[in-house]
């Protein structure tokens, strides 16, 4: 297919009223990516040189999302009136008129669309078809338009209400997705009339129009997941489950161990190397890369972070955006790391917050250590040198530097830099008063008794 040019027209103008949301339907997410983003990726993977998004409801929000996505060529067209699918496709007339070998028509609410089925439809065009319609076989075909075939040709798409008793027995159904030969696309769609009860222009009419002109029209079969759109929150959750199950399997087959795969939740761009172990109940947000041989313990939450080879994270750890856990470093239980580099072999084992910081190679951060990075207006950096030892329950008030090999005594609050190999105390000297504990206890007990008696 490399020598055939292709335009994908993505219909994303639907109202999406059944989602009951102020957010446009196509911007609801599967695996951390907007549904229309999945469709754009599928079209690009199927060889589309250019994308034309037709937007309507929430046009500015959809436009803002689409413009952030990478594409060799991406155009956005607004469908001002909702007059049917053929009318929607013609909103992208400018893009179609540039002259592509293949034109794909897909929907922005089909997040599970597999690039392979689009490639299969394009292959039909390469073999001489003018139109290739994507069909599927649902367990119960009720409600779907039927694909009527005769001697290997698709002769009509019949809505169920218009089907004969014999046609209702057909289980091959219309998904709405089409591939159209570019040289015929505009001519065919321009002939669609709105002579129906709703007064709309239906793209499916081009099947019969093409047949009347003696052009070859065929059907290409896809799995149900690729063919079904999302209309409400329940279907969104079902699609999420299907997507997650598929992605988990791909990771396991690539050499990643998921101890309880059904409890691990991934994002569209999650990267995990072989020989990494993921324990139960781990959540990956967008922007995560885990190298080979890492170990992510249970109940960890990771987003926009990098974990390098041999590092361990968790249990109950949170890596926020900008966290870098380098080779053989350790992030232990109930730790939060944000915009910080934990260098090779460094340890943050328990109950710590490390934000806007660098922790040098081999450094050890005691339990309860906090980098105080925010003064109410700005974030400030904490630098902890290689091999430094930070005692438990210490507060490092940024901006501050702890030199390589330095020791910080437990319970310290440090506001000044500590030189390399120095020992720093940032707490008041302990004072002990013999017998005063009993005096205080007796006094407080007497006051309590007076209040109780009153």
UniProtKB/Swiss-Prot annotation:
Keyword annotations from UniProtKB, A to Z: Acyltransferase, Cell shape, Cell wall biogenesis/degradation, Cytoplasm, Magnesium, Metal-binding, Multifunctional enzyme, Nucleotidyltransferase, Peptidoglycan synthesis, Repeat, Transferase
Family of this protein: In the N-terminal section; belongs to the N-acetylglucosamine-1-phosphate uridyltransferase family.
Gene Ontology MF terms: glucosamine-1-phosphate N-acetyltransferase activity; magnesium ion binding; UDP-N-acetylglucosamine diphosphorylase activity
Active site annotation, chain numbering: 350
Source taxon at top rank: Bacteria
Region (Pyrophosphorylase): 1-233
Organism: Chelativorans sp. (strain BNC1)
Reactions the enzyme catalyzes: alpha-D-glucosamine 1-phosphate + acetyl-CoA = N-acetyl-alpha-D-glucosamine 1-phosphate + CoA + H(+); N-acetyl-alpha-D-glucosamine 1-phosphate + UTP + H(+) = UDP-N-acetyl-alpha-D-glucosamine + diphosphate
Protein name (Swiss-Prot/TrEMBL): Bifunctional protein GlmU
Lineage: Bacteria, Pseudomonadati, Pseudomonadota, Alphaproteobacteria, Hyphomicrobiales
Pathway assigned in UniProt: Nucleotide-sugar biosynthesis; UDP-N-acetyl-alpha-D-glucosamine biosynthesis; N-acetyl-alpha-D-glucosamine 1-phosphate from alpha-D-glucosamine 6-phosphate (route II): step 2/2; Nucleotide-sugar biosynthesis; UDP-N-acetyl-alpha-D-glucosamine biosynthesis; UDP-N-acetyl-alpha-D-glucosamine from N-acetyl-alpha-D-glucosamine 1-phosphate: step 1/1; Bacterial outer membrane biogenesis; LPS lipid A biosynthesis
Region (N-acetyltransferase): 255-454
Binding site for Mg(2+): 109, 231
NCBIfam families cross-referenced by the UniProt entry: glmU (TIGR01173), PRK14353.1 (NF010933)
UniProt gene name: glmU
Record localization: Cytoplasm
GO cellular component: cytoplasm; membrane
UniProt: UDP-N-acetyl-alpha-D-glucosamine binding residues: 11-14, 25, 79, 84-85, 145, 159, 174, 231, 320, 338, 353, 364
PANTHER family: BIFUNCTIONAL PROTEIN GLMU (PTHR43584:SF3), NUCLEOTIDYL TRANSFERASE (PTHR43584)
Span list, region Linker: 234-254
């Amino acid at each position: 297919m490399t020598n055939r040019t292709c335009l994908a027209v993505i219909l994303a103008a639907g109202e999406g009223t059944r989602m009951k949301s102020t957010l446009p339907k196509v911007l609801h997410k599967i695996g951390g990516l907007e549904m229309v983003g999945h469709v754009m990726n599928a079209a690009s993977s199927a060889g589309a040189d250019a994308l034309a998004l037709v937007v309507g409801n929430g046009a500015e929000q959809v436009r803002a999302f689409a413009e952030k996505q990478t594409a060799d060529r991406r155009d956005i067209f607004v469908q001002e009136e909702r007059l049917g699918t053929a009318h929607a496709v013609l909103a992208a007339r400018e893009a179609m008129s540039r002259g592509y070998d293949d034109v794909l028509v897909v929907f922005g609410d089909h997040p599970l669309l597999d690039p392979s089925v689009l490639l299969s439809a394009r292959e039909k065009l390469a073999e001489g078809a003018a139109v290739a319609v994507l069909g599927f076989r649902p367990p119960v075909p009720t409600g779907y338009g039927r694909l009527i075939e005769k001697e290997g040709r698709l002769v009509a798409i019949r809505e169920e209400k218009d089907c004969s008793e014999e046609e209702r027995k057909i289980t091959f159904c219309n998904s709405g997705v089409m591939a159209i030969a570019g040289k015929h696309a505009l001519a065919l769609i321009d002939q669609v009339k709105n002579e129906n009860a709703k007064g709309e222009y239906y793209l499916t009419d081009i099947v019969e129009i093409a047949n009347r002109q003696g052009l070859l029209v065929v059907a290409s079969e896809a799995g149900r997941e690729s063919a079904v759109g999302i209309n409400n929150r329940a279907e969104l959750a079902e699609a999420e489950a299907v997507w997650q199950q598929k992605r988990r399997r791909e990771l396991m087959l690539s050499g990643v161990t998921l101890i309880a795969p059904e409890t691990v939740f991934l994002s569209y761009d999650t990267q995990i190397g072989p020989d990494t172990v993921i324990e139960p109940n781990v959540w990956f947000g967008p922007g995560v890369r885990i190298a080979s041989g890492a170990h992510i313990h249970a109940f960890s939450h990771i987003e926009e972070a990098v974990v390098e080879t041999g590092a361990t994270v968790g249990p109950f750890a949170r890596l926020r955006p900008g966290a870098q856990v380098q080779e053989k470093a350790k992030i232990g239980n109930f730790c939060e790391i944000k915009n910080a580099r934990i260098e090779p072999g460094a340890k943050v084992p328990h109950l710590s917050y490390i934000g806007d910081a660098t922790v040098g190679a081999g450094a050890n951060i005691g339990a309860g250590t906090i980098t105080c990075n925010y003064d109410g207006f700005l974030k400030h950096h904490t630098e902890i040198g290689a091999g430094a030892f930070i005692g438990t329950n210490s507060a490092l008030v940024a901006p501050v530097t702890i030199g390589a090999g330095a020791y910080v005594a437990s319970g310290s609050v440090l506001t000044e830099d500590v030189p390399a190999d120095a020992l720093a105390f940032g707490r008041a000297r302990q004072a002990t008063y013999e017998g005063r504990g009993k005096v205080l206890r007796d006094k407080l007990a007497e006051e309590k008794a007076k209040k109780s008696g009153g």
